[in-house]
Amino acid sequence: ILKVIAEFDEETTAELGRLIGRAVEITNILKNIKEDILGGHVYIPEEFLAAAEIEQGLAAKDILTHKNLYVARRKFAETARSSFAEAYRLLEENHNRNSKPVVYMLNLYHAYFELMDKRGWEIISPKPELKFEDRCRLVMKALLNRGGC
């Protein structure tokens, strides 16, 4: 999508793909954490669990209820935050009229990220939701090139 639709050069495509991919993946992990862990899948990397003093080898359901899970989520979120910032910087430098779908997608995931960040990383349920009006606003923002990029 980055190279074909947005017509970025090879280097920009590779870097944006890496940054956007990381930001979106982490946002999804943080957004879906309860369902994933209840399904037996812990996608937060071990380094962040260890930094939050969550013991290695703990059962998934015990990680879900661990008092320090919010610390691991907050630290993991910093990686997404820096990826969003770098992606926005690169998009700003390489913006063209064909990059609007990329800007919209990044704005959408960033909006989910911001909802979680504002309410606090200790809150895992319910999953954040964007209202229809908010999604429409994000489309207009991308089309009119306001905010984000």
Q: Would you name each region that the model predicts?
A:
Residues 3-23, 30, 34-149:
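Catalytic cores of Mg2+-dependent Asp-rich isoprenoid enzymes
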